[in-house]
Design a protein with these regions (language model features):
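Glycine-rich phosphate-binding loops of nucleotide-dependent enzymes
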Residues: 2-254
Length: 254
């Protein structure tokens, strides 16, 4: 049987900041429709690796390919153009703008006004499209003119994910998506990620919350001292198992 082609492949990825080596020779394949959790203690190299995948940083060594074709991400826009979107912990939302304005920030829709060469914002279409994206996520948000600052933490995550859908992202990187959220809001975010998976999206999850990882991940990658030392299906692993694996990796790196 022919093995499926990875959606994203990293080969020999390294990242250095002067004399500091943050990522060391990482090989990683990400397949369509899976949730991959990247775990590790502080300083393990997770954030630096994600910055390379998201285009925020260029690798110091190694190669990236999408569906077997070499690519280079010199900026987050390059990554977006190839279908890779990142939702950071702070969500990068403008709190005083409306839901629709946030979903379409940087890619606003326009329509002709009076003369063919004059264009104005197509607010009605942006509201309708924003509602469609949020409905895809089964998010209980109905008023697209509502300022984001009036939303709950889970609802804000839904807006940030909708913006990634607006960019037609195939891979959505989520950095600590439940950090600082209560139990109810965390459950909402977990449901949003499950919905992304059921719709065929690929999610790369960075989390220190092993319970979230166990609840969501198909596969777990554990890093330590810049290296990938675990890459396996989640299977029957528990949150305690993952914690022990991270600690064991720290001991090896020490």
């Amino acid at each position: 049987m022919t093995s499926p082609t990875p959606l994203l492949s990293l080969r020999g990825i390294g990242k250095s900041y002067g004399p500091v080596v943050a990522v060391r020779e990482v090989d990683l394949d990400i397949f369509p429709g899976e949730v991959v959790a990247i775990c590790g203690d502080n300083g393990a190299g997770k954030s630096s690796l994600i910055k390379v995948i998201s285009g925020a940083e260029e690798p110091s060594a190694g190669a990236i390919s999408m569906r077997g074709k070499p690519v280079a991400f010199a900026s987050p826009h390059d990554a977006l153009d190839h279908g890779v979107a990142t939702i950071y912990q702070d969500l990068a939302l403008a709190p005083r703008l409306t839901i629709a304005q946030n979903v379409f920030m940087g890619s606003e829709l326009t329509r002709p006004f009076l003369l063919p060469f004059l264009r104005v914002l197509d607010k009605k279409r942006m509201i309708a499209e924003s509602q469609r994206y949020l409905s895809q996520l089964s998010a209980a948000v109905t008023d697209m003119t509502r300022p984001v600052e009036r939303l709950s933490g889970g609802q804000r995550q839904a807006v940030a994910i909708s913006r990634a859908l607006r960019w037609n992202a195939e891979i959505i990187i989520m950095d600590e998506p439940t950090a600082a959220l209560g139990v109810k809001e965390s459950a909402l975010v977990l449901d949003l990620i499950r919905k992304l998976k059921s719709d065929g999206r690929t999610v790369i999850l960075i989390s220190h919350n092993m319970r979230d990882v166990v609840a969501l991940a198909d596969r777990v990658v554990i890093m330590g001292a810049g290296r990938k030392y675990v890459d396996q299906p989640l299977g029957d692993l528990t949150a305690d198992d993952l914690t022990h694996m991270i600690m064991a990796g720290n001991a090896k790196a020490a």
